[in-house]
A protein has these predicted regions:
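Membrane-embedded alpha-helical segments that form the functional core of polytopic membrane enzymes
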Residues: 146, 156-184, 232-246
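Acidic (Asp/Glu-rich) catalytic motifs at the cytosolic membrane interface
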Residues: 80, 173-201
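Multi-pass membrane catalytic core of lipid/isoprenoid biosynthesis enzymes
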Residues: 193-234
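Alpha-helical transmembrane segments of multipass membrane proteins
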Residues: 145, 149, 219-226, 242-246, ...
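Interhelical loop and helix-boundary elements at the membrane-water interface
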Residues: 124-140, 199-210, 246-264
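C-terminal cap/substrate-recognition subdomain and adjoining C-terminal extension
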Residues: 4-154
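Membrane-interfacial amphipathic/re-entrant helices at transmembrane-helix boundaries
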Residues: 152-167, 219, 223-230, 252
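Alpha-helical transmembrane segments of integral membrane proteins
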Residues: 127, 139-143, 158-169, 209-213, ...
Length: 270
């Protein structure tokens, strides 16, 4: 990753800089590989030491807790964490600070510890998910109903139901490609004036979630098409997917022209 364009939590950095100014010894303790962690520490310029994954030791959970206890002693340090892996570290830390955690991690942390600081997520997971899969773009797929309207078949119940199912399948397929596109373009998006605010680029929606949901949305689109629509529609969906993936790999002008021709194929597919 390009270190200077990573999505840093400014609210946390402000607090850490205040602590540093008051004489605190700051350690970047992370499960990230040390080659990346050291570059991050050098870029931020506030950490006195880096404790990170190296070799066969993954510096997370119990490994991180043991390392910090050896360095500073049990209950002799404050720890800022964000995931369920951090419970093992919070168990042995003096002060617990929760940063950018999920609702479940935050709730459990508040029930287990005397939490000193909470830096909450800007938006909920559901809102971030909706933004990541670009639900607002689904309206573009309403074009699928235009041929029904033009052929006066919109009042045909079976055709209308098939149209709605096709709309859902196309929307799920499109969302899978949006996730793929944002994963592939994450470094470029982080350097872009406006795209850096997209959930994945901004770090509000994790790559792990994106990698998990991408095949789910794609699989759902294929399954819906296979179960409820003619095989011709599934073939059309496959062409649509190939075209949109081609778009993701940079052939945007070709895609724009081809998409106009593609719309004329849809009416005969369901």
């Amino acid at each position: 990753p390009i270190i200077e364009f990573l999505p840093y939590n400014e609210q946390l950095l402000v607090k850490l800089r205040e602590m540093k100014a008051n004489g605190a010894y700051l350690v970047l303790a992370t499960a990230t590989h040390h080659t990346i962690a050291e570059k991050i520490a050098a870029h931020l310029g506030i950490f006195d030491e880096v404790v990170a994954t190296s070799g066969a030791v993954n510096m997370a959970a119990a490994n991180k807790s043991n390392c910090l206890n050896q360095k500073f002693g049990n209950k002799q340090y404050s720890y800022f964490g964000n995931s369920s892996d951090d419970y093992a570290v919070w168990d042995t830390s003096k002060d617990v600070h929760v940063v950018n955690a999920t609702a479940s991690v935050l709730t459990k942390s508040l029930s287990l510890y005397d939490v000193k600081t909470v830096v909450e997520r800007e938006t909920s997971f559901i809102k971030t998910l909706i933004k990541a899969i670009r639900v607002h773009q689904w309206m573009k797929n309403a074009l699928i109903f235009v041929p029904l309207l033009a052929s006066h078949q919109l009042t045909d119940p079976s055709m209308l139901i098939n149209g709605v199912i096709a709309f859902v399948a196309f929307s799920f397929c499109a969302s899978s490609v949006y996730l793929l596109n944002d994963m592939l373009d994450i470094e470029d998006d982080r350097q872009h004036k406006t795209k850096k605010f997209r959930p994945i680029a901004a770090g509000n929606f994790s790559l792990i979630h994106a990698m998990f949901l991408y095949p789910i949305f794609l699989g759902a689109a294929v399954l819906i098409s296979f179960l409820f629509l003619p095989i011709e529609f599934l073939m059309v969906l496959a062409v649509y997917y190939i075209m949109t993936v081609t778009y993701s790999f940079g052939l945007k002008k070709i895609f724009s022209c081809a998409s106009l021709c593609f719309l004329s194929v849809i009416p005969n597919s369901y």
